[in-house]
UniProtKB/Swiss-Prot annotation:
It comes from Aspergillus terreus (strain NIH 2624 / FGSC A1156). The gene is phyA. Its EC number is 3.1.3.-, 3.1.3.8. This is Phytase A. 1D-myo-inositol hexakisphosphate binds at Y51, R81, H82, R85, T88, R165, K301, H361, D362. Glycans are attached at N27, N105, N120, N207, N230, N339, N352, N376. One of its GO terms (cellular component) is extracellular region. Pfam families: His_Phos_2. Catalyzes the phosphate monoester hydrolysis of phytic acid (myo-inositol hexakisphosphate), which results in the stepwise formation of myo-inositol pentakis-, tetrakis-, tris-, bis-, and monophosphates, as well as the liberation of inorganic phosphate. Myo-inositol 2-monophosphate is the end product. Has a broad substrate specificity and is also able to dephosphorylate other classic acid phosphatase substrates such as p-nitrophenyl phosphate, phenyl phosphate, fructose 1,6-bisphosphate, glucose 6-phosphate, 3-phosphoglycerate, as well as ADP and ATP. The active site is at H82 (nucleophile). The keyword Lipid biosynthesis does not apply. Belongs to the histidine acid phosphatase family. It comes from the Eukaryota. It catalyses: 1D-myo-inositol hexakisphosphate + H2O = 1D-myo-inositol 1,2,4,5,6-pentakisphosphate + phosphate; 1D-myo-inositol 1,2,4,5,6-pentakisphosphate + H2O = 1D-myo-inositol 1,2,5,6-tetrakisphosphate + phosphate; 1D-myo-inositol 1,2,5,6-tetrakisphosphate + H2O = 1D-myo-inositol 1,2,6-trisphosphate + phosphate; 1D-myo-inositol 1,2,6-trisphosphate + H2O = 1D-myo-inositol 1,2-bisphosphate + phosphate. Monomer.
Length: 466
């Protein structure tokens, strides 16, 4: 496969953690913070699936988040989704068309619908919103603070997929990280700012563990779309009927209903730089309907990129094998989507670093989490009935891949242990690991953790891609 890499800097990294008490960015609203993420309108915003802004799941964690006093973090791999963005180009056109049709055909716009009469669709497509940029600055600050005994003296090695919103997210993470360091009187004042070290091209011509493109059978799959269509047919017609009764002259398809619901999160994350203003589209739907919408988006990701798609998890195998290499300081062994040109070069894939941060897309994160076995306890999701997180073993799109989602794979050395221990945090939720013996703090011994990644080490079912 061909390769094009933007190599901005190479850092030498070594290190160990506690937590610097640095203040949040000054323009935060009371419900949006570095430590807890987006807690504005939680009864709504936490039901926006993959369009929900990141919010901390610490209170939902089955294990404590704190690191024991007798342990020291020695390694961290961060994996993050880009921040809040405008809709994709195709969705922007679809949303605008739905609104235009309503404006053309409705004979009256009563009450909560009044804003629609003169509404002007003005969102762009694909790019980060100002709020999305701030999310990644916050993540950089959070990462610095959480691992400050390391970050005061060490820079993370940073990679990003070559999508503008992903690359910019990585750059904003760097800004937040460095701003936090500059505000820390205990930091090394001579340590240069981190930079985005490697940008990996996207597309079918390139192997890239941070963006899926090359598994032909997977790219042609319609499993996710079919599952989403099945559930949409269950709940959307009743909503369409209600809206049509409220807006005489209007006829709405199931897709129109989903388009109008999507306008709620997308406009909310676009209106202000801290998303403190709720879009008027949000008030057009009931709490029960938002629960259904949230489940629809979870279903779509599960059957599109997760365990519900036979070729979903294998899309994350390459990254899982890179993680194994970094944890064990050994060369990458993979025959799936790893870019061997990059990973064989210590300048573009160092094995001796302490801190790593990779930036990608929501779909890739879903596949990676399944390749790591984090949701092995999640059974096939119903396509006709809403299931909550107690029924899905903690899986939901809003809990897993919201805007600015972040996973931290930590390795720690503890006084009573000869071997380092590994745990995984997804949006501040310490994950119940599968495939290895877990202690009462959610940790496995490193060698057991690696051994448990048997699906990834065997290359999954990659042969079925072609």
């Amino acid at each position: 496969m061909g390769v094009f890499v933007v190599l901005l800097s190479i850092a030498t990294l070594f290190g160990s953690t506690s937590g610097t008490a640095l203040g949040p960015r000054g323009n935060h609203s009371d419900c949006n913070s570095v430590d807890h993420g987006y807690q504005c309108f939680p009864e709504l915003s936490h039901k926006w699936g993959l369009y929900a802004p990141y919010f901390s799941l610490q209170d939902e964690s089955p294990f404590p988040l704190d690191v024991p006093d007798d342990c020291q973090i020695t390694f961290v791999q961060a994996l993050a989704r880009h921040g809040a963005r405008s809709p994709t180009d195709s969705k922007t056109k679809a949303y605008a068309a739905t609104i235009a049709a309503i404006q053309k055909n409705a004979t009256t716009f009563p009450g909560k619908y009044a804003f629609l009469k003169s509404y002007n669709y003005s969102m762009g497509s694909e790019d980060l919103t100002p709020f999305g940029r701030n999310q990644l600055q916050d993540m950089g600050a959070q990462f610095y603070r959480r691992y400050d005994t390391l970050t005061r003296h060490i820079n993370p090695f940073i990679r990003a997929a070559d999508s503008s919103r992903v690359h910019e997210s990585a750059e904003k993470f760097v800004e937040g990280f460095q701003n936090a360091r500059q505000g820390d009187p205990r930091a090394n004042p001579h340590q240069p700012s981190p930079r985005v070290d490697v940008v990996i091209p996207e597309g079918t011509a390139y192997n890239n563990t941070l963006e899926h493109s090359i598994c032909t059978a997977f790219e042609d799959s319609t499993v996710g779309d079919a599952a989403a269509d099945n559930f949409t047919a269950v709940f959307a017609p009743a909503i369409a009927k209600r809206l049509e009764a409220d807006l005489p002259g209007v006829q709405l398809s199931a897709d129109d209903v989903i388009n109008l619901m999507a306008m709620c999160p997308f406009e909310t994350v676009s209106l202000t730089d801290d998303a403190h203003t709720l879009s008027p589209f949000c008030d057009l739907f009931t709490a029960a309907e938002w629960t259904q919408y949230n489940y629809l988006l979870s279903l779509d990701k599960y059957y599109g990129y997760g365990g519900g798609n036979p070729l979903g998890p294998v899309q994350g195998v390459g990254w899982a094998n890179e993680l194994i290499a970094r944890l064990t300081h050994s060369p990458v062994h993979d025959h799936t989507c790893v870019n061997n040109t990059l990973d064989a070069n210590p300048a573009t894939f160092p094995l001796n670093a302490t801190l790593y941060a990779d930036f990608s897309h929501d779909s890739n994160l879903v596949s990676i989490f399944w390749a790591l076995g984090l949701y092995n306890g999640t059974k096939a999701l119903s396509q006709t009935t809403v299931e909550d997180t107690t029924q899905t073993d903690g899986y939901a799109a809003a809990w897993t891949v919201p805007f600015a989602a972040r996973a931290y794979i930590e390795m720690m050395q503890c006084r009573a242990e000869k071997q380092p221990l590994v745990r995984v945090l997804v949006n501040d939720r310490v994950m119940p690991l599968h495939g290895c013996a877990v202690d009462n703090l959610g940790r496995c011994k490193r060698d057991d953790f690696v051994e448990g990644l048997s699906f990834a080490r065997a290359g999954g079912n990659w042969a079925e891609c072609f």
